[in-house]
Amino acid sequence: MKIVFSCLLCVTLIACNSKANDKALTSRMDSLEQKLSRSYKPGLGEFMFNIQVHHAKLWFAGQNQNWKLADFEIHEIMEAIDAIQQFNTDRPEIKSLRMINVPLDSVNAAIQQKSVASFKSSFTLLTNTCNNCHQATEHGFNQIKIPDSPPVSNQTFTVQ
């Protein structure tokens, strides 16, 4: 009988301790969820601004046949697209984002081939696709174009 009582007492203590641990874990999870909901999450506009700068830098890198810089810039754009899909899942525009994949791949291929002609045509396709996406997502007022001047004055785009 003492053995049965001891076993029941152990089971009861473990069960009570488990409930206390569950409450502590639930409380901790709630606290972390609140902190997470208040943490910084970049907006779609921030990503798009970033992409726009890299788009312009990509153009000048390609025009100057600075293929290493062009490769860097196209991958910065690709990373930003990936980040949009990770951090802006609540935005309906995300459904249209995949239309950019083929033009990005085309620009990337032109860079790997080091072909100025292919770069120009694929960059034009990329730019037009940006505008098509803007139209499809009711942001047609935001028209992107092939840049006239570099987006920054403190960077050279020629091969050094």
Language model regions located:
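Sec-dependent signal peptide recognition
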Residues: 1-7
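C-terminal motif of bacterial Sec signal peptides marking the signal peptidase cleavage site
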Residues: 14-15
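Immediate post-signal-peptide N-terminus of mature secreted/exported proteins
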Residues: 20-67, 159
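Amphipathic, charged alpha-helical scaffolds that flank and support histidine-based chemistry
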Residues: 67, 93-96, 100, 104-126
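Short, solvent-exposed, charged loop/turn and helix-capping segments
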Residues: 80-97
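The canonical Cys-X-X-Cys-His
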Residues: 126-138
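Short cysteine/histidine-rich metal-coordination sites, predominantly Zn2+-binding motifs
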Residues: 144-154
